[in-house]
Design a protein with these regions (language model features):
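Short S/T/G/P-rich N-terminal loop/turn motif that feeds into the first structured element of a domain
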Residues: 1-51, 58-68, 91-93
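Conserved short beta-strand edge segments in small beta-sheet-based binding/regulatory domains
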Residues: 36, 76-91
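Short, conserved loop/turn and helix-capping segments at secondary-structure boundaries
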Residues: 69-73
């Protein structure tokens, strides 16, 4: 299993609560629709960054496939424009 964690900041002036809801509604339903994506959680952060994404994948290959999957790319189009910065970490379990 691979765990994928991403921390984001949003652009200045973006409503953080509304943005996190859009991101959550776009990405969390992908579980069960993209092979190898086992779990997805998106939450507003209270310290350091604006929100955190936590996900689990069956394998490294399934994480790689997720990144370019058409459903993931379509979901990103709904919110990518209000993201400012991103830090990610992936690790095996």
């Amino acid at each position: 299993m691979v765990k994928h964690i991403v921390l984001y900041t949003l652009k200045e002036g973006v409503d953080k609560k509304a943005a996190v809801e859009i991101i959550r509604e776009s990405l969390e339903p992908l579980v069960g629709k993209i092979p190898g994506l086992l779990k997805m959680e998106i939450r507003q952060a209270y310290q350091g960054m604006d929100y955190a994404l936590y996900s689990e994948f069956e394998t490294r290959e399934s994480l790689t496939a997720y990144a370019s999957h058409e459903l993931h790319l379509a979901a990103k189009e709904k919110f990518w424009h209000f993201l400012d910065s991103r830090v990610a970490a992936d690790y095996d379990c």
